[in-house]
UniProtKB/Swiss-Prot annotation:
This is UPF0312 protein PputW619_0484. GO terms for cellular component: periplasmic space. Its main location: periplasm. Pfam families: YceI. It comes from Pseudomonas putida (strain W619). It is found in: Periplasm. Belongs to the UPF0312 family. Type 1 subfamily. The lineage of its organism: Bacteria, Pseudomonadati, Pseudomonadota, Gammaproteobacteria, Pseudomonadales. Keywords: Periplasm, Signal.
Amino acid sequence: MLKKTFAALALGTALLSAGQAMAAEYKIDKEGQHAFVDWKISHLGYSFIHGTFKDFDGNFTWDSAKPEASKISVDLKTASLWSNHAERDKHIASADFLDVKKYPEAKFVSTAVKSTGEKTADVTGDLTLHGVTKPVTFKATFNGEGKDPWGGERAGFNATTTLNLNDFGIKGPGATSQTLDLDISVEGVKQK
């Protein structure tokens, strides 16, 4: 009986979804300050240093009827890091840490999306940072989608993960932790 109920529910969902839009391509809206790549790292175990990467770009494919078919790609310029402290930023950008002259870009490309709830998913992909590529999983939340006041359509997500900097051949600067929390907020504009 349970199998028949599940099959009927799945068929009904499929029929309802058939009339809805297929997967659409979205460009991340960083120009309108609607997307952020923020980070934080523990300082001495007493507080956190917060920062952001100001120069990044990306896109994603999204179909609310089939979240598992979604994909995302984000490229960022490592020299665009900012923590509201010029000397610290210079040190983090140096060969002691990110070595932005040698590794000017970081990139994330998703390889799998697994729904974990009505509006949540695990987004796994390859992160290339400091010349090293490793699989990373982000905990993602779907914030919503719909029309915007300018005649377009948008969709928004938040995603978080914690990186072990040693995995990427990075030694923490000074008295900071070896783990870094990433918090990515994106709003995408549907491409026509």
